[in-house]
């Protein structure tokens, strides 16, 4: 079989159509397929003329309604995006130095943000009412937290062993030996550090306790006067003048899962009858060439199967500026003016049509709402780790989310996805300037969501959590190590955000959000320091002689005190704060029905197992987060990788590589404490034995087989598994369908396969006008690529080729027209198997 015949056989057309094509050479085939019979000055440009025909062979249902257009040079191009209507969106530089702002005010250059009143008098009165209520509630939270912390800290002070604080006089130590003075002060310095750390950590735990408690009361009562969801009755027709864009920024994600979830979401929107009010934008920042081609294929299949021409769009940026936030900003600049609202979706997001329509209705009913965040439920994973985390977030999450809403009201969080945003104020106020200066805490903002919410509120718009709106879903990382990879990026981002704590005009609630974001990760090194100082105090007590006399001519010795009954009482009180939210969560489920969680006994057993699991993982996370915080301050680079979205298990080698140092620390710590005092080892046992077991817990919990076994036993069962909503059932069905027809090695197929080359050529974005300089550059790229083996062609050079329709056409022609000359490419491609289901069957294509 000659190469021309082989080329024709690779086309998804009927045998009769193949027989009608010329077998003389490759150029003749492309000329025969070119309905316009164009003449090309170069023979290796001839594939450009057959792009339309080759696309119609493979994806005839995707080319309706003018999907195929001509660029300025007359080349065929897929209309993957609507015409841009640009808006101005530029950030104001950050002024993080309060001294500099004070100097500006002295010079009459006040930079306080200003905004115009947008509400009627009645709306302003309603707005002022909930803001006053929110302020009062937050003062109550502050008083409760601080009072509880003061009492606990004073109690902690009374049970520490060395109580001679008042007898220490620095002047008496001036004339004595330095070592003697140091040994006298050492226990008290350690105790002071312990006490300060205890106060900070207890305050952090106390705030979480009161948040969960108020969330429990909100959910138990079932009525919330200030819930934003109560502002609509739920069935109002959508305003045709207010259109909504569903935007999904993606970067090197699992293409099958992305498009399965997106299709399920769109099908659910269509089922509501409101699809005409929505458009979908897939905003790709992918830089893996194979994934880029797979995304193009998946988009073509999606618009064909759901009839999404003119409503579902795809764009891949060639310049990845500011990562996800830059991708969203780029959408706003080009197409944002065409929409009143946008819903931001993550790659693993799935939302029902009712939820999306509900968010739009809430926006229309609340004209001063800038962002409304839904409360996504975690589901869809099968590993033991993910199922345990799904159960935890499903059981405990509603309490904390409702509690956050209780304290924050319309000055709340935005989590970056599954939320609706009012586009105009977002464009005007939420562009993010890079943080000034140098170092690891300067440059592009990593965790953009909290900052965008703060800027929206600074401009006078409300930020709400619709915690009681159902139909919003997401997925969790499948194992501990993948979760920690994500946490490292979040840790760095939250530490960066704290630089904005003193920025002018930020609402106190969002300053608190920045603070809690930092404490989410800074609490780990603080806890580690607390444990380290406690251990050091025990070492001092065991190995040194107590200093009974701290003053000259002191009549009575100061004896170290050990009051285990008080220590146990304080420990029990702290455990109540930590675990009472879990108990309240299960109590709420017991009151409202346990059937969807597997029944009374199974949900109770699941709770106990989850508590054990969280105890085992807490010290492991503590050490990892400590390393992340230290890394951020030392300026170690954070790699921005997309998290693992599928059920991926951790190997033993990877586990011991990541957890080996923790295992060693746990062993040394345990042996040392056992040698010093077995009683102290009892208190440290949950910490040290969790570290020793960390590699084993990490591996076993990452296994999908173990997770599926617990699912069969109805442990860690959640309502979405007991009675899956249709949108999740559809997601699983579409995911299986996509996996069966998935495309691997997309770049090589885009070079060789007639259909995928036509697709890549039609979707290439570098469509410049012809020039001699450009032709020289194109020839250089093609020659350099073909003169090397495909293995040596790096990612960046592949992306350059993939972005230019002319280079893709020329590559395609040359490897088929001169296989002997480019034998390394041909041999490499012959070793690649094309999934037979990746393209339509010839008999189906001919019907």
UniProtKB/Swiss-Prot annotation:
Its EC number is 2.4.1.-. It is found in: Cell inner membrane. Its main location: membrane. Keywords: Cell inner membrane, Cell membrane, Glycosyltransferase, Membrane, Transferase, Transmembrane, Transmembrane helix. Residues 1-138, 217-511, 591-602, 703-847 are cytoplasmic. Pathway: Glycan metabolism; osmoregulated periplasmic glucan (OPG) biosynthesis. It is a multi-pass membrane protein. Residues 157-193, 535-567, 626-679 are periplasmic. InterPro entries: Glucans_biosynth_gluTrFase_H (IPR023725), Glyco_trans_2-like (IPR001173), Glycosyltr_2/OpgH_subfam (IPR050321), Nucleotide-diphossugar_trans (IPR029044). GO terms for biological process: glucan biosynthetic process. One of its GO terms (cellular component) is plasma membrane. It holds the Pfam family Glycos_transf_2. GO terms for molecular function: hexosyltransferase activity. The chain crosses the membrane at residues 139-156, 194-216, 512-534, 568-590, 603-625, 680-702. HAMAP family: MdoH_OpgH. Involved in the biosynthesis of osmoregulated periplasmic glucans (OPGs). NCBIfam families: PRK05454.1-1, PRK05454.2-1, PRK05454.2-5. Belongs to the glycosyltransferase 2 family. OpgH subfamily. This is Glucans biosynthesis glucosyltransferase H. It comes from Escherichia coli O6:H1 (strain CFT073 / ATCC 700928 / UPEC).
